[in-house]
């Protein structure tokens, strides 16, 4: 959280840059997690990067570039007055719509392991669904602020924002990216609760979302296998349960505090993508 040093709001970028105060605890937590994550990136990727790229620092270097870019974005976003985000929101929504449609087009969207979720621009790859997480929060915050007098009405209050949010989530589901859709749906429901919608409206929304989620899981074999593997990975130890079993082995051999920095074994090609989201 960042606050200005006086009640007068600075008007220029440099005035804002010189007159805000950091939330020390939040910044320290951010830096700690960032440092720890960087160490883990190198620890899990060094062996694989050394074999594939002949450079054990390949993924670490790429990660540090992303960190620098991320700090730049955080700084600019922090120094941007909140009303500006509201003014830019229609353009942001249009850009997200274009990108989420583009990613579904063969030859434009980049397919990785069965999911077409990536766009590549000037050699830089990114997932539009990740950007949608931020844009959706901005949209909901702006909508709930504007519709505050009608928030307890379904037709004039939460209904329209549910339709808009659902449409964007449908585009993401077509990639398919079920996990991101679940996260976005949870975000929408939480923001509606905080925004003051009627409890029975919220209960109805939760019921519909849960029913759709169960239906989507049961109608797709690979999703069902993931659920069953989570409950009992030993039924399919070489396929859907493989990574969970590897995590058991890692915890069993390392105990509470692990084997020591750089001494883990599961990264030694026992896992297909130890350096990504495992």
Ranges and model annotations:
Residues 21-27:
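Membrane-interface helix starts
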Residues 23, 177, 236, 273, ...:
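Acidic side chains
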Residues 11-12, 19-21, 97-99, 248-249:
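A short linear-motif detector with a strong N-terminal bias
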Residues 1-19:
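Short, Lys/Arg-rich, polar N-terminal cytosolic tail immediately upstream
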Residues 27-35, 39-43, 49-243, 249-251:
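Hydrophobic alpha-helical transmembrane segments of multi-pass inner membrane proteins, especially
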């Amino acid at each position: 959280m960042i606050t200005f040093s006086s009640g007068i709001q600075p008007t220029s970028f440099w005035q804002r840059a010189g007159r805000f105060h950091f939330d020390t605890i939040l910044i320290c937590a951010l830096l700690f997690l960032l440092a720890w994550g960087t160490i883990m990136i190198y620890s899990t990727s060094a062996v694989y990067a050394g074999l594939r790229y002949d450079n054990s620092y390949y993924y670490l270097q790429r990660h540090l570039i992303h960190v620098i870019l991320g700090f730049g974005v955080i700084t600019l976003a922090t120094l941007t007055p909140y009303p500006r985000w509201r003014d830019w929101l229609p353009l942001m929504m249009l850009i997200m719509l274009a990108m989420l449609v583009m990613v579904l087009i063969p030859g434009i969207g980049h397919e990785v392991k069965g999911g077409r979720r990536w766009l590549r621009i000037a050699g830089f790859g990114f997932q539009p669904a990740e950007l949608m997480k931020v844009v959706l929060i901005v949209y909901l915050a702006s909508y709930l602020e504007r519709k505050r007098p009608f928030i307890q009405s379904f037709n004039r209050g939460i209904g329209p924002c549910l339709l808009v949010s659902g449409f964007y989530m449908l585009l993401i589901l077509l990639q398919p990216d079920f996990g991101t859709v679940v996260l976005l749906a949870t975000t929408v429901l939480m923001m509606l609760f905080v925004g003051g919608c009627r409890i029975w409206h919220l209960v109805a929304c939760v019921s519909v979302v849960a029913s759709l989620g169960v239906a989507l899981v049961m109608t797709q074999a690979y999703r069902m296998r993931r659920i069953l593997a989570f409950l009992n990975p030993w039924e399919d130890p070489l396929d859907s349960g493989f990574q969970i079993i590897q995590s058991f082995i890692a915890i069993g051999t390392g105990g509470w505090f692990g084997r020591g920095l750089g001494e883990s074994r599961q990264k030694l090609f026992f896992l297909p993508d130890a350096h990504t989201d495992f």
